[in-house]
Design a protein with these regions (language model features):
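Short, polar/acidic, helix-capping and beta-turn segments at strand->helix junctions
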Residues: 14-168
């Protein structure tokens, strides 16, 4: 069994397929976010990549904050979820050597900071699922769980973690 542990992402990741579309604009994935604590951003073991939770941020800057159903609407939460999906792919790109090494996204788990009574977590997660299919085609189809929570780190509205099969 082979394990690859990625504990120090570079400042810039530039595989050939790092452009992501967001409402007609192209966003280039220039960096992999460093972890906010004593854990690894991704581990690849026996052809399976386990990506730690990703917040909608660039470096230290949180780009979305608040609770969905209170001060964050569904459209903004979907954008945040799409960004988190891009960051999951960027983490795998760094650890595995490129987006083309992703064989299949297996599972996506999304945590949505939800106002009391908000029950449309699955709608929020469609932003991430749509982004994965847009970028990876059929390789981006996955099993998914959407969980409403009271709070997330740094006040983020969305956090995603991913499991994917990768070519070693």
């Amino acid at each position: 069994m082979r394990s690859l542990i990625c504990d120090s992402p570079p400042a810039i990741v530039r595989p050939p397929t790092t452009a992501a579309r967001n409402e007609g604009r192209v966003i280039e994935m220039r960096s992999v976010n460093k972890p906010g604590g004593n854990y690894l951003p991704v581990i690849i073991h026996s052809g399976i990549a386990y990506v730690s939770g990703q917040l909608p941020r660039r470096g230290e800057d949180l780009l979305y904050a608040g609770k969905v159903g209170a001060n964050v609407d569904i459209a903004a939460a979907q954008e945040a979820a799409a960004l988190c999906a891009d960051l999951c792919i960027a983490a795998i790109n760094h650890a595995a050597g490129g987006e083309d090494r992703i064989v299949q996204v297996l599972q996506l788990v999304g945590y949505i900071a939800s106002a009391p009574g908000f029950t449309q977590q699955s709608q929020v997660m469609n932003g991430a699922s749509d982004r994965l299919i847009e970028r990876l085609g059929e390789r981006g189809r996955h099993a998914r769980t959407s969980v409403g929570v009271a709070e997330l780190p740094r006040g983020a509205p969305v956090e995603l973690n991913m499991v994917a099969a990768v070519r070693e």
